[in-house]
Amino acid sequence: MQERYSPTAVEAAAQQDWQARDAYRVTEHARNADGTEKPKFYACSMLPYPSGKLHMGHVRNYTINDMMARQLRMRGYNVLMPMGWDAFGMPAENAAIKSKVPPAKWTYDNIAYMKKQMQAMGLAIDWSREMCACDPEYYKWNQWLFLKMLEKGIAYRKTQVVNWDPVDQTVLANEQVIDGRGWRSGALVEKREIPGYYLRITDYADELLDQVRSGLPGWPERVRAMQENWIGKSEGVRFAFPHTIAGADGQLIQDGRLYVFTTRADTIMGVTFCAVAPEHPLATHAAATNPELASFIEQCKLGGTTEAEIATREKAGMRTGLTVTHPLTGAPVDVWVGNYVLMSYGDGAVMGVPAHDERDFAFAKKYQLPIRQVVAHEGKAYSTDAWQEWYGDKQGGRTVNSGKYDGLPYAEAVDAIAADLAAQGLGEKQTTWRLRDWGISRQRYWGTPIPIIHCADCGPVPVPEQDLPVVLPDDLIPDGSGNPLAKNEAFLSCSCPRCGKPARRETDTMDTFVDSSWYFMRYTSPGNDQAMVDARNDYWMPMDQYIGGIEHAVLHLLYARFWTRVMRDLGLLKFDEPFTKLLCQGMVLNHIYSRKNAQGGIEYFWPEEVENLYDAKGAITGARLKSDGSDVNYGGVGTMSKSKNNGVDPQALIDTLGADTARLFVMFASPPEQTLEWSDSGVEGANRFLRRLWSHCHAHRDAVARGLAAGADWAQAPAPVKDLRREVYGLLKQADYDYQRIQYNTVVSACMKMLNAIDDAKLPEGAHADAARAETLGVLLRVLYPVVPHVTWLLWRELGYTHSLGDLLDAPWPHVDEAALVADEIELMLQVNGKLRGAIRVAAKASKADIEQIAAAQEEVARFLEGRPPKRVIVVPGKLVNVVG
C-alpha cells in the first residue's frame, strides 16, 4: 500500500478493474446466492445534450444518481443506472455553420469526449444500454409511433398561428417561449401561419391533471403545481354574441356568431366591449377596408403567442368599427382588436367587463370605454378611479345592475345566466384548458424526419412501416439559410407509396422533446430492432427515481407523461406514470465579476482573475483585477455559465485533485435539492479529508489485518473500545436514515465524524483494539464508498476486507449493532447548588441511591459545600445530579 494518496493512480486502478469485468452491466431478474430474486431499482438522470464538455451541474446530477445506485446495490437491489444522449437539436446546426462540419461529426465527437469524462467520474453506468437520439435505430421508433398516432387521430396536420423564431428559423412550442423570446436563441418571437403536425395532448388533459393532483406523491409539490397550472383547467360558459356581419361572399362570418368563453358569466351584464385576436375573421374582414387597422394587426404579429408573453406585453387595441349584439340585453357591443387575445385559446375572442377584470379595467381606462359595475360587496363602495382587488372577487358578492339577475351570489348567477343562454341556443356550460395541442413540426435539419410523403395527387401520405426509418442524411452542412433538407434532392425525391408517382418527402423534423419523451424506456430494451420496447420494459418500469433540473417541470416531464399514456393506449405498456419519484437537484452557483467595456457591453472575468474586497463583517463588497488593480463589479453568485466566465471545468479538477474530490465536495456542500455555492476552499477541504483517510488507513493497516483475523468478545472490551463502537454505530444509524431521505450532505458529514472518532480514539493495545479498528473502519469505508468509490474500493482491497466481505461493489451494507449503542456507563453533569462543577461517570443501570452516594462523595462537593453535609441530592436521570447544601 502506497504511503501517500495519489488520486490519479487510485482512480486509474479502480476504473481499470471495473471496466475489465464489466462491473456495472445488469440483467433482468438478477438473483441472490440463495436463488431468491433481488428487488429491482431503476434510477436515472435526465440525459444530457452533447454540447462538448460536462459542467459541474452534470457532475452533481450524476453523482446523486451514482450514490443512490451504489448504496442500493450494496443493500441487495438489482440497480439500473443507464446513460444516453439527447443528440438532436439546434446547437449542433449552429456549431456546424460556424465550423463548417456536419452536425453528425460535431455531435459524435462531443459524445466521445463526454463519455470519457463520465467514465473518469467513476459512474456506475451500464454502457451496454447506451442510446443516442440521432441514431436511426432509435429515431425509427419516433417515426413508428408517430404513424400509429396518425392512424388513431392523435397526430394530425393543420395550419395555425405559431411562434416563429427568426434567428433559429423554426417554430417553437408555447412552452419554448420565455418572456417573448426563443428559449435557445433569445430572439423576439414572431407570429406566423404555418402548416404542421400536432399531437392531441389535450385528449389526455383530464387524466394528466388528475394524476398530477393526487397520483404523484413522490414528486416535489412545486413541480406538481407548475404542471397543474400549465394544464390550466377552467370551468365556465361558452356563449355567442349574435351579429349580421357578412363577408365578401355575402355569407355571415362564422354563421353570425362571435363566441367567447368566460369563467365569470355572472358579470355578463357588465360587458361594454368585445376584443378579438389579430387573426380573427372579424379582424381580417374589418382590416380589408381599414389600412390603419391592417397596420396595427401586422404590429401585433411581432409578438409571441404564449399567455406568459401576452401577460407581460403592454395591452393595446384598435376599434374595428363593427358591432355585435349582447345576447341578453340586445344592446350593440363594439368589437376591438386586442394584442392580448390569443387566436389559439378558445375562440380567439373575449368579452370585456372592465368593472370586474383588471386587464379589461386598464384597457377601458386607456381607451375611455364605459365601466359598468354589476357585482357589489356589502360595505364596499365601487369607484372607477382606480382598480381595487375586491372588484374581481367572485366570492361574497351579489349581482347588481343586472335586471332579473339582481341579488344573486356567484354560483346562482352563473347557473341562471347559463340556463337563459342555453334556452336561446346561444350558450352552454363548458370546460376549457390552458394546455394546447403539441406542435411537433420544426423547420430544421438536425432532428427526426417526419415520415410523410407529399404527392400531388394523393396529398400527404404516411411512409409505410416497412420503409422505416426515414434516414436523415448525416453529411449535410447547414449554411444558415433555412433547412438544408429542402435543398437536398437525394433526400427529397421519392415515389408515392399509394400511386407510385414521383413525390417529395416532408422536410420538417420533429421537436427534440419527442426524443426525450421515451428514451428512458429504450434503455430497458436495448438491441431490439423489432419493437419499440419489449418485456424487459415491464420489469424495469415505471422508473423508481428520476433526477433532473426543475427547468424541465413543464416541458419534458409533461410530454413524457403524455407519451407514456399514448404508448399505454397502444398496448405497449401496462402503467400510467413513467416516474414514481422525482428529485430536482439545485443549480451550482459561483461568483460573478464584470464591468462595462469600451463598446458599452459587459465584460466578465473569471473568479481567479480578481481579488475580493471585504467589509468589516467579511462580506464581499467589490473586487479588483489582479493584473492591473482596476475595479470590477461584484454581482453576487449566479448559475455557472460559460457566458459569465464563472464556470468550473470538471475535467481540470479531476486531472488535478481527482474525481473523488469533486464528488465529495458537490455532495457535502449542500442538500441535493438546494443550490450549491462553489468554494475553492471547500474543494481543498474535501481533498484534505481524503488524504487524511488514506494516511489513517496506511498507519493502521497492520492493526486492521490483525483485527480481521481475530474475533472479539465485545462484552469484555475496555471502555474506550466500547465508546468508539457506540459512536460509530450511532453515526451509521444516522447515515442510514439520511441515505433513505437522499440527504447526502449529512451522509458525508456522518462519515467525517466517523473518521474523527476512529482517528482520535485512544485505544489500549490488544485484540479488542485491533478488532474495533477493523470493524469501525470497515463501516466507514462502506458508508463512504457511494460518495467516493475509487479511494474506498482500493483501501477496502488493500486492507484485506475483500477476503471476508467480498468486493466492495457488492459488499453487504453494514447493519447497526444495537447492543453497541447501549452504554455500560453514562456521564452525568455534576452541579453543586445549581452551578456546574464537573461530571461523574456511573453505571448505566445505577440506582438513584447509588448516584446520590457517588455524587456526595466527590471532592468538588466537599469543597464547594465547605464541609457542610448535603441537605438533599436531586437526580435528573441520564442528564445531571445536583447536590444542594
UniProtKB/Swiss-Prot annotation:
Short motif 'HIGH' region, span: 48-58
Ligase listed as a keyword: yes
Pfam family, one: tRNA-synt_1_2
PANTHER family: LEUCINE--TRNA LIGASE, MITOCHONDRIAL (PTHR43740:SF2), LEUCYL-TRNA SYNTHETASE (PTHR43740)
One annotated GO biological process: leucyl-tRNA aminoacylation
Residues reported in the UniProt entry to bind ATP: 642
Name of the protein in question: Leucine--tRNA ligase
Annotated gene: leuS
GO molecular function: aminoacyl-tRNA deacylase activity; ATP binding; leucine-tRNA ligase activity
Alphabetical list of InterPro entries matching this protein: aa-tRNA-synth_I_CS, aa-tRNA-synth_Ia, Leu-tRNA-ligase, Leu_tRNA-synth_edit, M/V/L/I-tRNA-synth_anticd-bd, Methionyl/Leucyl_tRNA_Synth, Rossmann-like_a/b/a_fold, tRNAsynth_Ia_anticodon-bd
NCBIfam families (UniProt xref): leuS_bact
Family matches, as SUPFAM superfamilies: Anticodon-binding domain of a subclass of class I aminoacyl-tRNA synthetases (SSF47323), Nucleotidylyl transferase (SSF52374), ValRS/IleRS/LeuRS editing domain (SSF50677)
Superkingdom, taxonomy of origin: Bacteria
Subcellular localization, as worded in the UniProt entry: Cytoplasm
EC number: 6.1.1.4
Stated family: Belongs to the class-I aminoacyl-tRNA synthetase family.
Motif 'KMSKS' region location, chain numbering: 639-643
Substrates-to-products reaction catalysed: tRNA(Leu) + L-leucine + ATP = L-leucyl-tRNA(Leu) + AMP + diphosphate
GO CC terms in record: cytosol
Keywords tagged on the record: Aminoacyl-tRNA synthetase, ATP-binding, Cytoplasm, Ligase, Nucleotide-binding, Protein biosynthesis
Gene3D superfamilies assigned: 2.20.28.290, 3.10.20.590, HUPs, Isoleucyl-tRNA Synthetase, Domain 1
